[in-house]
């Protein structure tokens, strides 16, 4: 037997689809192209030493179905036969999966590529709109997801298909604009001298922002975790936490607006991940949308672009499942990202 890389787009069922984030891993199995997915409990990546161990014990040992194909979405760039995950110690080794777990075909995509596939595959009730035109345009879209890290992807519409454009947009520079920003930013933790989007617009970024506000105000922080900060900000019990959520929404709106301009995303900007859902009321309060639209000389364009918060936890699996069922609907390059067993 010889494992080779193949760019052909068609998948043999059953297909195991998996969304591997920095903290959680979600899996489901499609028995055929028409079947509803068989879902499995959400896994904590820290509970398993390797992804192979997680798949074996939590998936394969729990069902009589043996998947022939696997499509994984992972947090981080996909490059080579050993794929390191961002914010997680797992390493994806597709050839080893084929040899050890009985798969015939393994495809690995970027996690926000899967989120991009999802935005044209989800039902309307899986999203909450914040401003912009109510109708859904068949046009380019952007997905932005603050969570363990900050994921970014585009989704470009061609004549006949949707083309996901993955990237590492969470690591772009983010800087101060207002007088208050200039008071806070000197206290934000830097990575090699830079403040990146992920240093503010993520779970740990939320805490970085809170600590920066406390330092600017010359007070001792009393809240430890992003969950504590979010809760205190939402109920108004802590002024610094409340400002943290307001500024988080503002900075997220600025970045979302920048990306909408870069892609000219008339199809909308989509916010995914756990944080936007948890702080939905803060995102709807006004600061987010005001920052999103404040893009002179193109405010009129920005007013029309909708922002939608994805409220469905299994969105990435929905996107991967859509790709598995109807690959011709999408133009996804699997060159160098697909490994097949030839017998």
Curated annotation (Swiss-Prot):
Disulfide pairings: none
Matches recorded under NCBIfam families: glk, PRK00292.1-4
Q: Provide a Gene Ontology MF annotation, just one.
A: D-glucose binding
UniProt-listed Enzyme Commission number(s):
2.7.1.2
Q: Which of the seven top EC classes does this enzyme belong to? A: transferase
Q: Which reaction does it catalyse?
A: D-glucose + ATP = D-glucose 6-phosphate + ADP + H(+)
| Keywords per UniProt | ATP-binding, Cytoplasm, Glycolysis, Kinase, Nucleotide-binding, Transferase
Q: Which family does the similarity line name?
A: Belongs to the bacterial glucokinase family.
* Localisation: Cytoplasm
Q: Where does ATP bind?
A: 18-23
Q: Which HAMAP family match?
A: Glucokinase
Question: Would you tell me the Gene Ontology cellular component terms?
Answer: cytosol
A Gene Ontology BP annotation from the UniProt entry? glycolytic process
This protein's name: Glucokinase
């Amino acid at each position: 037997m010889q494992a080779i890389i193949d760019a052909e787009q068609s998948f043999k069922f059953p297909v195991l689809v998996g969304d591997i984030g920095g903290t959680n891993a979600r899996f489901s199995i499609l028995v055929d192209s028409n079947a509803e997915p068989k879902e499995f409990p959400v896994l904590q990546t820290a509970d398993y030493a390797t992804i192979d161990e997680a798949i074996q014990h939590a998936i394969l040992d729990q069902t009589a179905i043996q998947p022939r194909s696997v499509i994984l979405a992972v947090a981080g760039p996909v490059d080579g036969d050993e794929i390191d995950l961002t914010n997680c110690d797992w390493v994806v080794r597709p050839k080893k999966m084929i040899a050890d777990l009985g798969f015939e075909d393994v495809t690995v995509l970027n996690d926000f590529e899967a989120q991009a596939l999802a935005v044209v595959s989800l039902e309307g009730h899986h999203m909450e709109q914040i401003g912009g035109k109510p109708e859904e345009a068949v046009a380019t879209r952007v997905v932005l997801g603050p969570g363990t890290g900050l994921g970014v992807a585009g989704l470009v519409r061609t004549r006949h298909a949707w083309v996901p454009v993955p990237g590492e947009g969470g690591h772009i520079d983010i800087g101060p604009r207002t007088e208050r920003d200039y008071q806070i930013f000197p206290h934000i933790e830097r990575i090699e001298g830079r403040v990146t989007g992920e240093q503010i617009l993520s779970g740990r970024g939320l805490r970085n922002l809170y600590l920066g506000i406390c330092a600017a105000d010359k007070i001792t922080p009393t809240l430890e975790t992003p969950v504590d900060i979010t809760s205190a900000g939402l109920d108004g019990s802590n002024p610094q936490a409340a400002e943290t959520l307001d500024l988080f929404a503002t900075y997220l709106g600025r970045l979302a607006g920048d990306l909408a301009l870069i892609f000219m995303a008339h199809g909308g900007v989509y916010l995914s991940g756990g944080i936007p859902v948890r702080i939905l009321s803060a995102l709807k309060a006004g600061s987010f949308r005001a920052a999103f639209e404040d893009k002179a000389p193109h405010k009129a364009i920005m007013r029309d672009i909708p922002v939608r918060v994805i409220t469905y936890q299994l969105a990435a699996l929905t996107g991967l499942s859509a790709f598995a069922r109807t690959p011709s609907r999408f133009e996804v390059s699997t060159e160098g990202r697909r490994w097949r067993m030839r017998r």
